[in-house]
């Protein structure tokens, strides 16, 4: 791997406090670009010799290989961050990406679970009463009730939960911490889970969510658990932990929460990220409209 790429990854790791998952994504994108340049430049990759044309040719190559515009733009973002780093460090004098734009994409609206469907799932008998069943039910409850990311959920330790204050301390992206309140119902579920866990599993590691062997639950296992349970909802097009994060935000806004408050609970750095959920409030707008006396009238002048 190029020494400058290595330096950039260290910068992300130690100065920006990016997660290893994010750093690995940057690494793969930059390695892919390095391989492309080497193929065109007889095995040589010198960042200072990269020009706009080769970046654009890389984009064309990705699209020709059926890489989606969304993925191409993500890769391009990684490359832009890399060259911004090189510019700041004085390794390059010109940024070859300053005039490069990615392919246009249609921004899909977030998938979310309807409140009725979620209630039927969580209050139903689709979970066993053993350790894993109690744990899995709580996982879905916490994702839906708090809006945390799956990495944040598996990263919870017992000491992060204050049952008296009814607050959860969550460590998010770049190690930023935030406090999320929880209700009495969720408190009872968490206490019930810890009782079963401490009785049936050797959980001395300190992690809140663990496997049967007592080790910390991984994001991969959590994803599988959520996907399996959400697949019981036939109308749901996508089944993932992030869908429950979308559902949390949607429910909060539909029930009158302010956008800024939802932003803080989700751990977003800007309102722009949170505003994608405002589309769902159209359901409430329709209800308001249909409360209008003229909206209740059937027919109309020409429909008499």
Task: Report each predicted region and the residues it spans.
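Conserved catalytic core of the tyrosine transesterase superfamily
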Residues: 1-304
């Amino acid at each position: 791997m190029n020494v400058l790429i290595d330096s950039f990854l260290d910068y992300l790791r130690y100065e920006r406090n990016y997660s290893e998952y994010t750093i690995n994504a940057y690494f793969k994108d930059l390695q892919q670009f390095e391989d492309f340049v080497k193929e065109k430049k007889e095995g040589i990759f010198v960042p200072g010799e990269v020009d706009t044309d080769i970046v654009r040719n890389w984009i064309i190559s990705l699209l020709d290989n059926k890489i989606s515009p969304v993925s191409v733009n993500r890769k391009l973002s990684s490359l832009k961050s890399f060259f911004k780093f090189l510019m700041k460090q004085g390794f390059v004098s010109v940024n070859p990406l300053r005039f490069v734009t990615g392919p246009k994409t249609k921004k899909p609206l977030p998938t979310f679970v309807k409140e009725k469907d979620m209630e039927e799932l969580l209050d139903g008998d689709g979970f066993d009463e053993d350790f894993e069943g109690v744990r899995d039910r709580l996982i879905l409850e916490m994702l839906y009730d708090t809006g945390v990311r799956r990495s944040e959920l598996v990263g919870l330790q017992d000491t992060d939960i204050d049952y008296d204050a009814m607050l959860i301390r969550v460590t998010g992206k770049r190690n930023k911490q935030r406090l999320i309140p929880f209700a009495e119902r969720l408190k009872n579920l968490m206490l019930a889970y810890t009782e079963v866990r401490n009785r049936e599993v050797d959980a001395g590691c300190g992690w809140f969510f663990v496997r049967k062997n007592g080790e910390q639950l991984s994001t991969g296992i959590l994803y599988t658990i959520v996907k399996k349970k959400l697949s019981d909802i036939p109308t749901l097009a996508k089944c993932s932990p992030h869908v429950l994060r979308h559902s949390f935000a949607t429910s909060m806004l539909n029930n009158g929460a302010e956008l800024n408050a939802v932003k803080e609970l989700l751990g977003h750095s800007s309102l722009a990220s949170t505003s994608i959920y405002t589309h769902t409030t159209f359901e409430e707008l329709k209800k308001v409209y249909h409360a209008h006396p003229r909206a209740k009238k059937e027919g109309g002048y020409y429909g008499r």
